[in-house]
C-alpha cells in the first residue's frame, strides 16, 4: 500500500514537470522514500545481531538463577516507624532480634539490620537468612508463636509502626553469600522492579558485570523476589562513606564492558530505588 501511495503522489509530480524529466524524478523520489521507510527496519535487524539473546527456557527462573549448593531463603522487612518512636524501636530490635539470631534452636540468622539514611525516612530494614529454605522459615514462624519475648516485642512494635511489608528472596548464584563484616560502613540497597519475563536476561548480564564491581569489596549480596513484589531485584553494596561510593561507582566505567551492561539492562527496568542505610548496633554487617 505504501508503494502505491508513493506512485500516486509522484505521478502528480511527473505530470507537472513533464514526461521526460518527471519520470526520472518520480523514480528517484520513490527510491529515496522507500529506502527511508525500510532503513529503520534494516537498522533494527542489523543491531539485533549484536544484542545478547536469551535462550528459551523450560524451567522457572528461580531454578536457573539461584544457588544450587545452598538451600537458603531470605526475608527482607521494611518497617516505617513513627518518627518519635524510632529510637525506642531500635532499642527494642537490638535486644529481641539479637536473641533470635544467637539462639541455635532457630534455623535463621540476622544478616543485617539498618535505618534508612537517604530514601524513606524513619525506616528500618531487616534482612534474615533461613538455612533450609521454606521448611526452616515454617519452623521459625511456628516456634516464635510460643516465644514470650517475641510476642511482647511484636505487641510493642505494633504501637510504633506506621506500616510494614516484606518479601521472600533467593540469592543469585553469581553473588557471594553475605557474611559479617567489620565497619564502619554505609550500605546501599538498590532495588529494581524489572519488566515481567526479563529476569533471566538480567541474570545473564549481571553474571558478567559483578566482576567489575568487586575491586573494593563493595558487593555484599544480590537477591531476587519469590513472594511479595515479583520481578524485584535487590543489590546490596557496602562503602566506607558517600565519597567512597561515588569514587567506586565512577571507577566501574573505566572497565571495558561495563558500559555495555548498563546499556542493555536499563531497558529491562520499570522502576528503581536507592536507599543509603546505616547499620544498627546489633547488625552483623557493620
Curated annotation (Swiss-Prot):
It is found in: Mitochondrion matrix. Residues 1-40 form a transit peptide. Gene3D superfamilies: 3.30.70.100. Keywords: Autophagy, Mitochondrion, Transit peptide. InterPro entries: Dimeric_a/b-barrel, NIPSNAP, NipSnap_domain. The keyword S-adenosyl-L-methionine does not apply. The keyword Transit peptide applies. It holds the Pfam family NIPSNAP. One of its GO terms (molecular function) is protein-macromolecule adaptor activity. GO terms for cellular component: cytoplasm; mitochondrial matrix; mitochondrion. One of its GO terms (biological process) is mitophagy. Belongs to the NipSnap family. Protein involved in mitophagy. Accumulates on the mitochondria surface in response to mitochondrial depolarization and acts as a 'eat me' signal by recruiting proteins involved in selective autophagy. This is Protein NipSnap homolog 2. It comes from Danio rerio.
